[in-house]
């Protein structure tokens, strides 16, 4: 067993952050050169670290067409904290699911991501909603999909 601890030289409050700050901590296991027989597995993974108190994301969603005329959902974060997208659906005004997407993305402050909507086409975004189950509560996170 290995325990790894890390921290900051000053408190988060002393950093005077204007928005949430983000780091990616990478862990790479180096295989032992002494073990020459059999198979060895070296782990290599990274973990996002988000630092800041009281900051909130401010999300907007709209559809665009890519160079092959496929529908793409643009998710933009105008807020001061990251937003995590997981499994979500596109629903109409009555709550009917039009498309389910299973993905995992982080959208950092002042950034956007493009999410391909394979097989989904629409001529109007009127009444369409981005609906995602919230990990923090039993309610869903719901956003209107706006015209571009």
Residues covered by each model-derived region:
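Intrinsically disordered, low-complexity Pro/Gly/Ser/Thr-rich segments with frequent PxxP/GP/PP motifs
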Residues: 1-14, 96-124
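Envelope-exposed proteins and targeting segments
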Residues: 2-4, 21-23, 45, 69-71, ...
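Terminal connector regions
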Residues: 11-52, 56, 122-148
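Surface beta-strand/loop "capping" patches
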Residues: 55-73
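A generic structural signal for beta-strand entry/edge sites
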Residues: 68-72, 112, 127
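Asparagine-centered strand-capping/turn motif at beta-strand->loop junctions
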Residues: 73-79
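Short acidic/proline- and small/hydrophobic-mixed sequence motifs that coincide with surface turns
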Residues: 80-85
């Amino acid at each position: 067993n290995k325990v790894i601890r890390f921290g900051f030289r000053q408190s988060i409050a002393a950093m005077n952050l204007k928005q949430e700050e983000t780091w990616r901590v990478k862990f790479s296991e180096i295989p032992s050169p002494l073990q020459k027989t059999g198979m060895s597995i070296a782990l290599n993974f990274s973990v996002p670290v988000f630092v800041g108190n009281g900051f909130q994301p401010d999300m907007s969603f709209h559809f665009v067409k890519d160079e092959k005329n496929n529908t793409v959902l643009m998710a933009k974060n105008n807020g001061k904290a990251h937003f995590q997208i997981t499994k979500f659906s596109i629903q109409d005004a009555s709550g009917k699911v039009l498309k389910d997407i299973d993905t995992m993305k982080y959208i950092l402050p002042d950034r956007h991501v493009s999410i391909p909507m394979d097989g989904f086409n629409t001529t109007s975004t009127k009444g369409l909603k981005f609906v995602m189950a919230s990990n923090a509560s039993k309610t869903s996170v719901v956003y209107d999909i706006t015209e571009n």
